[in-house]
Amino acid sequence: MKEQPARSLVLDSEALSRLLRNDRAMAARIEASRQAGVPVLVSALTIVEAVHGKTDVSRLKWVLSRLRVEPVSQEDSLTAVGLLRDAGGLHGHKYAIDALVAALALRVPAPVIVLTSDRDDWSKLRGSHVSIREV
């Protein structure tokens, strides 16, 4: 069965980090999604996870202006708690941000593609309408 085209693209911290480092392959993926009318989303928490002391703040602001930054709501938090529980009782201390990004992926229009370097973590947290693509 042919996979449906994505209606939402969600970035994890490594995908965002690559954009911040001006990785050409990542920039091309994002631009292709934008050209296809697919919104490119990032959780507000992912920003904090992806940034480090040497991040160029001007570059960060420019990259974020080209993405849809999504806030974290109480509903997202409760969904994340359920995802952690359903994944065998994963602990929020280690998996909190991934679980909250997974909650974001579950509330946006499906089908959803998540760009991540953590395929193993995501295989535990994603819903049936969320596909994983490695960066």
Residue ranges and their predicted role:
Residues 11-12, 42-43, 94-95, 130-135:
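Histidine- and aromatic-rich ligand-binding microenvironments
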Residues 16-17, 47, 77, 122:
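A generic structural signal for short hydrophobic patches within well-formed alpha-helices
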Residues 3, 69-119:
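Active-site neighborhoods of divalent-metal-dependent phosphate/nucleic-acid chemistry enzymes
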Residues 22-23, 53, 83, 125-128:
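Residue-level signal for well-ordered alpha-helical positions
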Residues 1-42, 49-67:
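Short, well-structured N-terminal submotif of metal-dependent ribonuclease cores
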Residues 61, 121-128:
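Short loop/helix-cap segments at secondary-structure boundaries that form the rim of catalytic
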Residues 57-61, 87-88, 131-133:
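Short, hinge-like loop/turn segments at secondary-structure boundaries
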